[in-house]
Amino acid sequence: MTRRRRIYEGKAKILFEGPEPGTLVQYFKDDATAFNAQKKGVITGKGVLNNRISEYLMMKLGEIGIPTHFVRRLNMREQLIREVEIIPIEVVVRNVAAGSLTKRFGIPEGTQLPRSIVEYYFKNDELGDPMVSEEHITAFGWAAPQDLDDMLALALRVNDYLSGLFLGIGLRLVDFKVEFGRLWENEEMRIILADEISPDNCRLWDVKTNEKLDKDRFRQDLGNVAEAYQEVAKRLGIMPEAGPGDMKAPKLVQ
């Protein structure tokens, strides 16, 4: 196995130097974290499933003209992505009350919101990813007003498309978190969708039973986390070729 330069390691993924300039290899780990990494665990096969699910959803979004960093899947756990300058803001789109929203406003979980609500969080683990306003983002220079307009428009388009896609397979898109990056091409800069889209950063409930098929199973100790992720992949029609058995993590060369 060739040694690769590790660029960055996050809670659920590792970024390696890519084979050509302007690319990176995104490796999906089995590590699971919740509550800003206060709770940690390992879910065997999660990385494989998230790689496939994110590939599928990024490709689908690309087909409707949403620019993403995804280039192609390389193997069970890795995908080739475009190197972008990540904007340190998490964009959360909420359709149904869940998670921190229920605590902040005393709304019962599962309440359909009057309309989709968009929130921004500053990506900073030490500070616990605080919620911020558009004013904070532009005043502190994390993103320009035009960047923010683009991010909002893209996030709402992603929500519209994915809500319909998931509804078609019997899942309700309760809420999700996305990240964006700046891609520079010939002196031109554009905002594109980055990171991943998977049950790690989407809340997905079964339409009929309200069963949770996402990372809340880990957060809330509901059990059967891998099985829930497999169910999402199965409904999308993309279970890994080898089935859930072939999901052991390969040994990483340090």
UniProtKB/Swiss-Prot annotation:
InterPro entries: SAICAR_synt/ADE2_N, SAICAR_synt_PurC, SAICAR_synth, SAICAR_synthetase, SAICAR_synthetase_CS
Record-level Gene Ontology MF annotations: ATP binding; phosphoribosylaminoimidazolesuccinocarboxamide synthase activity
Pathway(s) it belongs to: Purine metabolism; IMP biosynthesis via de novo pathway; 5-amino-1-(5-phospho-D-ribosyl)imidazole-4-carboxamide from 5-amino-1-(5-phospho-D-ribosyl)imidazole-4-carboxylate: step 1/2
Name of one Pfam family that matches: SAICAR_synt
CC per GO annotation: cytosol
GO BP terms: 'de novo' IMP biosynthetic process; cobalamin biosynthetic process
EC assignment: 6.3.2.6
Keywords from the UniProt entry: ATP-binding, Ligase, Nucleotide-binding, Purine biosynthesis
Catalytic reaction annotation: 5-amino-1-(5-phospho-D-ribosyl)imidazole-4-carboxylate + L-aspartate + ATP = (2S)-2-[5-amino-1-(5-phospho-beta-D-ribosyl)imidazole-4-carboxamido]succinate + ADP + phosphate + 2 H(+)
NCBIfam families with a match to the protein in the record: purC
Recorded family membership: Belongs to the SAICAR synthetase family.
Protein name as annotated: Phosphoribosylaminoimidazole-succinocarboxamide synthase
Originating organism: Rhodospirillum centenum (strain ATCC 51521 / SW)
